[in-house]
């Protein structure tokens, strides 16, 4: 297995009086797509936000390679090569696709290298280049949101539930694009509720429950063990269709 790019050790996060993350331990291998799974309210999104510094860990450590980023602020963490695609997507509805991407590029420069990178993974965006982002479909908005995150090369991309609310055919298109992104060597940590997408994309997996990591391993092994899926995720047989 590749060496870890990101390592969380004993991470705790409090939000107000609530103890959300309780000793979270797992790592994200370099060049792999790691799925972060769990039932609603398990702490998955809080984990992503804590990695990015949007919430501060109250105990434990987070390392990006050898750098301790536990108490770093969000701009500093982003400058180290971590990008975040929130569930809300974070796009500007009144701006065109081109303008959204230019805002995400350094100095607003969409040069040929950046355009080639975007269109390699999401060629469909060419058709909507000058269209306001608010007029895009859900799947197109998700493609734009991920493109904003990768317009510059990143060490790590955090993605929160990219398939939520999308039709099955659109999910399959998004899976294909993310597989290509993974093949490029981009390291990804993804929260996902759609088990088909998780099974199709994941190399490694960490499963959360009540703010704790209750399982780590390879996604292929979890996908092959329906009993383990039921115990960890509450999945029934119809979830595999």
Enumerate the language-model features and the residues they cover.
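Catalytic Walker B motif of ABC-type/P-loop ATPase nucleotide-binding domains
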Residues: 157-161
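Conserved ABC transporter NBD signature motif
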Residues: 60-68, 80, 113-114, 120
């Amino acid at each position: 297995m590749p060496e870890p790019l990101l390592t969380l050790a004993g991470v705790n996060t409090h939000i107000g009086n609530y103890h959300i993350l309780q000793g979270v331990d797992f790592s994200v291998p370099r060049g792999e797509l790691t799925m972060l799974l769990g039932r609603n309210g398990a702490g998955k999104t809080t984990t992503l936000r804590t990695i990015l510094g949007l919430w501060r860990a109250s105990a434990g450590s987070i390392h990006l390679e050898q750098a301790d980023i536990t108490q770093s602020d969000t701009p500093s963490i982003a400058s180290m090569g971590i990008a975040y695609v929130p569930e809300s997507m974070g796009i500007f509805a009144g701006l065109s696709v081109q303008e959204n991407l230019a805002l995400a590029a350094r100095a607003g420069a969409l040069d040929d290298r950046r355009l080639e990178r975007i269109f390699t993974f999401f060629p469909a965006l060419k058709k909507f280049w000058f269209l306001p982002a608010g007029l895009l479909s859900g799947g197109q908005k998700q493609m734009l949101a991920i493109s904003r995150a990768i317009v510059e090369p990143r060490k790590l991309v955090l993605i929160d539930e990219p398939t939520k609310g999308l039709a099955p055919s659109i999910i399959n298109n998004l899976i294909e694009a993310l597989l290509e992104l993974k093949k490029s060597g981009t390291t990804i940590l993804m929260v996902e509720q759609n088990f088909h997408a998780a099974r199709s994309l994941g190399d490694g997996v960490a499963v959360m429950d009540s703010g704790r990591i209750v399982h780590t391993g390879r996604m292929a092994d979890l996908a092959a063990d329906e009993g383990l899926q039921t115990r960890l995720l509450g999945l029934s047989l119809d979830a595999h269709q």
